Amino acid sequence: MSPFISLDELPQGSSVTFYDSSFFKRGSETITLPTPSEVLARPNFIQHPRAENMKLRIPAVFQELGLAVKHSDSTNTIISEGQCLWAVRRFLPKVPVPEVYGWTQENGIAFLYMEYIDGATLKDRWDSLTVTEKEGVCQELKTNITEISRLRQAPDDEFIGNISRRPLSDMVFTGTNFPPVGPFSSATELHDCMSNMFKWPAKVRQPDIDLADVLDPYRDMLPDDCAIHFTHADLNPVNIMVSKDSPCRVIAIIDWEQSGWYPAYWDFFKVEMTTKPGSEWQTEYLPKLLKEPDPDCCEAFYSYVNSYAP
C-alpha cells in the first residue's frame, strides 16, 4: 500500500530542531547544533569551474560531528529541502537519504543541518567500477526510484509544486528570467504555463498580442493525463553517494532542493539533460532506471526548456 502525505503533516516554521534525531542521542553529554556564525566560519565557497568571477556555495562540514550544513539566501528552498528529507525518512524508510537534524534562519540566510555522508559520488567512482558493480548500483537506484514514486498526495488535494505547495524549485524554471512557477492543481495547468512561457517572446515583440493567438506546435504533445509523482528532479551521478570501497553500494541520495510533485515523465528528462550527451550513463544505464517518455513528449519538453534560457 502506498504511503500518503498531507501538507499538515510536514514540520513547519522558520526554525525547527529535531531533538528525537540521532544527533542528540550521542552519549551522555549535552550536544547542540553549531550556530549560524560557526557555520559561516567554515569553508563555504569554491571557485566556479567555468566562471572566473563566480564562486559556488558549498555545505559547511563538521566531520567531527558527522554533520553537514547547507545554507542559502533562498530560504524557502532550504526549508522545503529539509521538509523533504524529513518526509522521505518517515514515509519511505527504504530510500537512503541524509537524516535531517533541523533548520534555522539568521540575517536572511537559512541553514539546514543534516547528516554528513562519508562516501564518494557515483560520478567520481563510475569509471573505475566493474560492469557487475554498475549493474548492481543501477538496480539499487531503480528500486529507490520506484519507492520514491510510491509516495502519494491526499487524493482530494493533488497539486504540482514543491513539497510544501510552493513554486517549483527546478532549475528549468529558476534559472530563467521568469517569475516563480506554480504551484498548479494539475498537469494541464503546468503545461499551459510552459506553453505561455514559450510564447512570451512574441508578447515582448508585440505587447498587444493575445498569447492564445500565438502558434505553439508543442502544447498538444504533452500528456495532460499524466500521473503526478513525487520526484527528486536532479538524479545526476554527483547527487548519488556510494561506498568508497568495493563492492560499490548506494549509501545516500542527496541534494533534494529541486524535488517536489511533478508529472511522472519529469525525472527521465532531468537525468538526461544534466548528464554528458552520449555517455555510457546516459545511453546505456538511464533507460534501465527510468522509462523514456514517448517521442512527442520528448520533443515538446526540450523545445520548451531550450526556449527558456535567459
Where are these regions (language model features)?
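An alpha-helical support segment within catalytic cores of ATP-dependent transferases
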Residues: 134, 147-233, 243-246
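ATP-binding pocket architecture of kinase catalytic cores
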Residues: 38-180
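Charged phosphate-binding loop/patch that engages nucleotide di/tri-phosphates or the phosphate backbone
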Residues: 17, 21-22, 44, 49-51, ...
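Juxta-kinase regulatory segment immediately upstream of eukaryotic protein kinase catalytic domains
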Residues: 1-49
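Active-site Asp-x-Gly
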Residues: 187, 225, 229-231, 236-238, ...
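Residue-level signal for well-ordered alpha-helical scaffold segments within enzymatic catalytic domains
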Residues: 86-90, 143, 147-150, 252, ...
